[in-house]
């Protein structure tokens, strides 16, 4: 509750500054870039942010530390691969995305630069879902607050000095800050060392995807509706 209030307060302050510094056109452009990256990240996350929490919480509730370790390893390796693939696909399709969204190729280069956010977001979501699965509620709240603070402290100077040209750097730097924060807290988690043969990895990944992909589909429809 407290973290939600802080986030809302900081969000109101950021929104006010952004509106003044960027104007309606700049705010609209920032929102479109954000929505594009969110839509792609939703697909490339494969729903692991939902299924990962469920599987880790289940294994942790059974005090099965070895399975928790296997699931965590599977999630971490998968989000790296899917994030890299998503980034590459975004770069390849950047021209089409720009044309479809803005009816022009002018935004192709910014979308190429922003494609790294897909990877950064994937990794950050993976770390956060591990914390959620292990019920690190206090850490999640701190990550949320730091995310709002960092986003504000990064975006306002970018917009003040560069105007609309600061949108792309601010989004990338905010994603880096969010990843750094989540990684800082995720590193504190004690996970036992365990081998992860390919057979077991495939089994765990199959379990994660069987629940995650339908969740991803639902989330994609919600995100894509805002994009369209």
Model features per residue range: what roles?
Residues 88, 92, 103-127, 141-145, ...:
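Alpha-helical transmembrane segments of multi-pass membrane proteins
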Residues 182-227:
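Interhelical loop/hinge segments that connect adjacent transmembrane helices in multipass membrane
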Residues 24-30, 62-74, 84-115, 160-169:
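Membrane-interface helix-capping segments at transmembrane helix termini in multi-pass transporters
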Residues 1-6, 111-117, 130-156, 168, ...:
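Alpha-helical transmembrane segments of multi-pass membrane transporters/permeases
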Residues 16, 46-62, 133, 191-194:
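Helix-loop junctions and terminal segments of transmembrane helices
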């Amino acid at each position: 509750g407290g973290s939600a209030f802080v986030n809302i307060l900081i969000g109101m302050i950021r929104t006010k500054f952004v509106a003044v510094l960027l104007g309606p056109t700049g705010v609209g452009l920032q929102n479109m870039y954000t929505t594009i990256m969110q839509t792609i990240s939703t697909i490339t996350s494969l729903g692991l942010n939902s299924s990962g929490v469920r599987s880790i919480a289940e294994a942790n509730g059974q005090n099965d530390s070895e399975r928790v370790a296997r699931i965590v390893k599977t999630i971490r390796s998968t989000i790296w691969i899917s994030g890299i693939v998503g980034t590459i696909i975004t770069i390849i399709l950047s021209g089409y995305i720009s044309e479809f969204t803005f009816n022009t190729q002018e935004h192709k280069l910014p979308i190429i630069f922003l494609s790294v956010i897909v990877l950064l977001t994937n990794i950050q979501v993976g770390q956060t879902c591990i914390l959620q699965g292990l019920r690190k509620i206090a850490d999640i709240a701190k990550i949320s607050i730091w995310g709002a603070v960092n986003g504000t402290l990064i975006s306002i100077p970018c917009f003040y000095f560069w105007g609309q040209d600061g949108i792309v750097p601010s989004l990338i730097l905010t994603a880096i800050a969010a990843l750094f924060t989540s990684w800082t807290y995720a590193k504190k988690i004690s996970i036992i060392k365990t081998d992860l043969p390919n057979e077991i990895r495939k089994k765990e990944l199959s379990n994660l995807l069987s629940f995650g992909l339908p969740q991803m589909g639902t989330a994609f429809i919600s995100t894509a509706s805002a994009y369209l």
